[in-house]
Amino acid sequence: MKVLSYLKNFYLFLAIGAIMQASENMGSQHQKTDERVIYLAGGCFWGLEAYMERIYGVIDASSGYANGKTSSTNYEKLHESDHAESVKVIYDPKKISLDKLLRYYFKVVDPVSVNKQGNDVGRQYRTGIYYVNSADKEVIDHALKALQKEVKGKIAIEVEPLKNYVRAEEYHQDYLKKHPSGYCHIDLKKADEVIVDDDKYTKPSDEVLKKKLTKLQYEVTQNKHTEKPFENEYYNKEEEGIYVDITTGEPLFSSADKYDSGCGWPSFSKPINKDVVKYEDDESLNRKRIEVLSRIGKAHLGHVFNDGPKELGGLRYCINSAALRFIPLKDMEKEGYGEFIPYIKKGELKKYINDKKSH
């Protein structure tokens, strides 16, 4: 009886262990109801894991092997098992959609390259999107269709339901945190190039704008007037936060890129994203200038000049305060701009200013 009892317990232990291993290998660990998961392959997983962890809304990223021929593998056997180096991305759908997460992913992979990313060549370095929720397939297909319109050549990104997932060895987890100067084929700074969705903002009618805006705000944004220097709301504002289009609410500039140029108007080294502003030639005042307008609202913002700090790109966006609304860092989450908080906190401009002061 003791032997029988022992055998029962032994086999029960094996069964439980097998179930737990299968759960992990198939990527089906219990997720919280407010979490989602997607698996992304994009060459060496060291860089892709570190990159994904920098994206607002990503809860966790870890390295593993996906969609091979066998239920088990390791780093040394990938050429035999045909697994792809991949990153398991757990994210909060309230903070970032799958569509936007994929657009961040597309920024750091060559979508038409077959079995090669960066200097890494081989089947294990193929690109792929592997899903566990069948509803994600439609989102993935839509994102790839949009991407195909932007690139030359046929997209080579593999799209399949997740299978035979194996978590990578601990040595590979958080590799670039452990080895900051380690190999990485991805430019991690691309995570700071925030994506601003144009379908979230609309331009109000002229009637609405006249009611919503002050006389000065209306004249500046709609009739290209210029406010007085040194007598406007934001020219010397140093508080951390985001500057949005006064007419639409679309994010335009960040305190992280604001500096004192001495001109009397708010000055920025660049917009929060290159796509949120448009440019037109301006030959008024008998001189050539480049006018800056907002993307959605088409509001006049100011002008851009090439006399900015060379260390920050050499540009000076000279913008009217009346064209902007400032949202303090502490209020950004509740006002719907939480995804831009990491960008506001980055220290590129502060480091430049501190370096200038120390010399």
From Swiss-Prot:
Q: Does the keyword Oxidoreductase apply?
A: yes
PROSITE patterns, A to Z: MSRB (PS51790)
Question: What is the enzyme's main class?
Answer: oxidoreductase
> Which Enzyme Commission number(s) are listed?
1.8.4.11, 1.8.4.12
Q: In the UniProt record, does the keyword ATP-binding occur?
A: no
What InterPro entries has UniProt attached to this entry?
Met_Sox_Rdtase_MsrA_dom, Met_Sox_Rdtase_MsrA_sf, Met_Sox_Rdtase_MsrB, Met_Sox_Rdtase_MsrB_dom, Mss4-like_sf
- Which residues are catalytic? 44, 318 (nucleophile)
Protein's job? Has an important function as a repair enzyme for proteins that have been inactivated by oxidation. Catalyzes the reversible oxidation-reduction of methionine sulfoxide in proteins to methionine.
Q: Which PANTHER family match?
A: METHIONINE SULFOXIDE REDUCTASE, PEPTIDE METHIONINE SULFOXIDE REDUCTASE MSRA_MSRB
Question: What is this protein's name?
Answer: Peptide methionine sulfoxide reductase MsrA/MsrB
| Organism, scientific name | Helicobacter pylori (strain ATCC 700392 / 26695) (Campylobacter pylori)
